[in-house]
Design a protein with these regions (language model features):
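Glycan-recognition and catalytic cores of secretory/periplasmic carbohydrate-active enzymes
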Residues: 19-268
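Bacterial Sec-dependent N-terminal signal peptides
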Residues: 1-23
Length: 268
């Protein structure tokens, strides 16, 4: 099976190599070829990337497929879907292997990355099973919501621990993209509910326009850790707020200033 799959992928890449590609497409293909060479055929996961980063690599691969119409990519998506949905993510205190099923594990942010990947997979392929999986994952993410600190979801489960930017912005982003894919108003409600809470937490530091990592035990933001993925996902959420005309003036102002912190100018 592996040889057949690999042969199919290589054949498609060979066919693509015989056609004239723009320099941009050629570089993309180069990157994807290299990336696919690192994917473990048994687990479906990319070597050295680990669990949640493999979701990001898959998303990048899907976007490559959307741009280039590379016919090999749907097979890659299918292979990851079937092999990685039951995956060993570690061992417990007794040394017993721990597995995740349906891309659900002990960290809500990990789940968010996978949900977003499957939404994109559904958009590219038209396969409903990928969208169904994203909805299953999101449903589990909602179990992280609590009234502690006024709302929001936790980062970790078993036990529930730490309300932070990455888990909540991925939750909001998944909600709005599921709404766009399904038109189910419940997802829009979750999006609005969670972004309203997040905007009140102070995790968007408007003194320096950086995203704070999370909240302390007293529910105030900790102001000692800034990570680029927090900034990036927050920008994506604010862009969705703007596009959906939700708190548009506020989101435009914050988005403009966050991007300015990177030396970029938009929405002028």
């Amino acid at each position: 099976m592996y040889k057949h799959f690999l042969t199919s992928v290589l054949l498609v890449f060979f066919m693509l190599s015989c056609s004239k590609l723009s320099p941009f497409e050629g570089k993309m293909r180069e990157c994807v070829q290299t990336s696919l060479s690192w994917r473990n055929d048994t687990t479906g996961i990319w070597e050295t990337a680990g669990w949640w980063n493999s979701a990001n690599v898959l998303t990048a691969t899907i976007r490559y497929g959307a741009v280039t119409k590379d016919p090999a990519i749907p097979s890659v998506i299918e292979d990851v879907f079937e092999k990685a949905r039951h995956y060993q993510v570690g061992v417990d205190s007794t040394g017993t292997p721990r597995y995740c099923d349906n891309f659900i594990n002990d960290y809500y942010d990990d789940e968010g990355w996978w949900a977003l990947a499957w939404i994109e997979a559904s958009k590219l392929t038209g396969e409903k099973k990928y969208l169904d999986m994203a909805e299953i994952i999101f449903d589990d993410m909602t179990t992280g919501w609590s009234d502690a600190c006024g709302g929001g979801i936790f980062w970790k489960k078993n036990p529930l621990h730490y309300k932070n930017s990455i888990a909540n912005n991925l939750f909001s982003l998944t909600a709005i993209r599921l709404y766009k894919a399904t038109q189910n108003p419940a997802y829009l409600d979750w999006f609005k509910k969670n972004v309203d809470w997040y905007m009140r937490t102070g995790m968007i530091n408007t003194d320096i326009y950086q995203i704070e990592d999370g909240t302390k035990d007293d529910c105030t933001p900790n102001r000692n850790a800034h990570y680029t993925y927090n900034q990036g996902v927050a920008i994506a959420v604010l862009a969705e707020m703007y596009l959906h005309s939700y708190r548009m003036e506020f989101s435009a102002q914050i988005l403009r200033n966050l991007l300015a912190a990177f030396g970029m100018s938009v929405l002028s």
